[in-house]
Amino acid sequence: MTVKLICTSHTPLMGFGSPPEATEKHVRQVFQQLAEQIKDYDPQLIVIFAPDHFNGFFYDLMPAFCVGVRANAVGDWDIGKGPLNVPENTAKDLISALYDSGIDVAHSWRMQVDHGFTQPLMLLCQNLQRYPTIPIFINCAAKPLPTCRRAVELGRAVGQFLFTTDQRVLLLGSGGLSHDPPIPQMGQVPPEVEEGLIAGRNPTKEARQKRQIRVIEVGKSLARGENIVAPLNPQWDDELLRIFCSGDIRRLASLTEGGIAIQGGKGGQEIRCWIAAFAALSVYGEYKAQRHYYQPIKEWLAGMAMVSAQPVTQIGA
């Protein structure tokens, strides 16, 4: 009945953008250090909370939350492709437990996940099959969004289920911190772009490449100081990290979509995934968190952060 948590930003521009060499080296070193910790811990179950970027979930049917019973990575940005190692019976038991807790999640037997899930799994676990993994999608991009309060309730319900299992559990939260990727918004784009947001599954290789080139160019523009998207916000990121590490779940639940958008940009909404993960951890009691890394990396369009935590009762055990 042990648990550990790691929350990390993700950025598809790692490997495509060009920050100072020392910056990228440091990021990869910290990921490797965390990967070694996971290897030593040898989790029997990973539960990952992550968003999607209109690669697997679309406006034709957009859930607030979805648990994958079976899941396949689409391989966007060449970051992991193929099936995840989902323990189906455990995933179904989790879904039933969430229903009993009043959390009406969607569930999928053909979930498509993108780099929001696969980048942390690849960097921390080396592949998508190494550990049994239950993916939990949180809608952080397709307005209207679930509230942060509801993300807390989801996380706590997941934590209550995991607390009853006799397994070494690793909680992963993926997303944020401040960043403002060029994600089209319904009502603000031409009909053909809206159609891609509604039903854009399985795009052609050319269409995916065109979309990725656009994101790369925005990263280059931001690095040149051309704020064609909202700038990164280190002050907001730092305060968020302080709150996460303090254990103030109530404060996290009070964050609003509008406030996050002003301070953290469109991509800042992904902190719901961190919120759910920390809320799940809080079920185990008081926790101690460690801030491993933070740097605003314009070339990657990301306030890049990595944090780990575990219950104080398990430290040194």
Curated annotation (Swiss-Prot):
The enzyme's E.C. designation: 1.13.11.16
Gene3D superfamilies xrefs: LigB-like
Keyword set, alphabetical order: Aromatic hydrocarbons catabolism, Dioxygenase, Iron, Oxidoreductase
Oxidoreductase as UniProt keyword: yes
Catalytic machinery residues: H115, H179
Cofactor list: Fe(2+)
Family note: Belongs to the LigB/MhpB extradiol dioxygenase family.
UniProt subunit comment: Homotetramer.
Protein function: Catalyzes the non-heme iron(II)-dependent oxidative cleavage of 2,3-dihydroxyphenylpropionic acid and 2,3-dihydroxicinnamic acid into 2-hydroxy-6-ketononadienedioate and 2-hydroxy-6-ketononatrienedioate, respectively.
Protein's name according to its UniProt entry: 2,3-dihydroxyphenylpropionate/2,3-dihydroxicinnamic acid 1,2-dioxygenase
Organism: Photorhabdus laumondii subsp. laumondii (strain DSM 15139 / CIP 105565 / TT01) (Photorhabdus luminescens subsp. laumondii)
Lineage: Bacteria, Pseudomonadati, Pseudomonadota, Gammaproteobacteria, Enterobacterales
Designated gene of the protein: mhpB
